[in-house]
Each structure stands twice: as structure tokens, then as C-alpha cells.
Amino acid sequence: MKVLASVKRICRNCKIIKRKGVVRVICSSDPRHKQRQG
């Protein structure tokens, strides 16, 4: 899980979602693409 100021999709399987007011990226193909804005 990377904590970044600016979250971006790394691959086409990455999805940008908002959970409890926090912007996150989840990825089905590569778990290393997970990010959180903070």
C-alpha cells in the first residue's frame, strides 16, 4: 500500500474508489498497485 498525495491508475485493471472519504486505488491484477491518498 503506497500512501501518496496524488493517486493515479498504474494499469488498466486499477480502479479508483472512495471509501469513508479516502480516495483509494485497488487493482485485481497486481496488489502492488494499491494506493491511498494521504
UniProtKB/Swiss-Prot annotation:
GO CC, alphabetical: cytoplasm; ribonucleoprotein complex; ribosome
Keywords: Ribonucleoprotein, Ribosomal protein
Any Gene Ontology biological process: translation
Cited InterPro entries: Ribosomal_bL36, Ribosomal_bL36_sp
Domain of life per record: Bacteria
Residues making up the signal peptide according to the UniProt record: none
Origin species: Ralstonia nicotianae (strain ATCC BAA-1114 / GMI1000)
Membership in a protein family: Belongs to the bacterial ribosomal protein bL36 family.
Name of this protein: Large ribosomal subunit protein bL36
Keyword presence, Phosphoprotein: no
Pfam families from the UniProt entry: Ribosomal_L36
Ribonucleoprotein recorded as keyword: yes
GO molecular function ontology, one term from the record: structural constituent of ribosome
HAMAP family in UniProt: Ribosomal_bL36
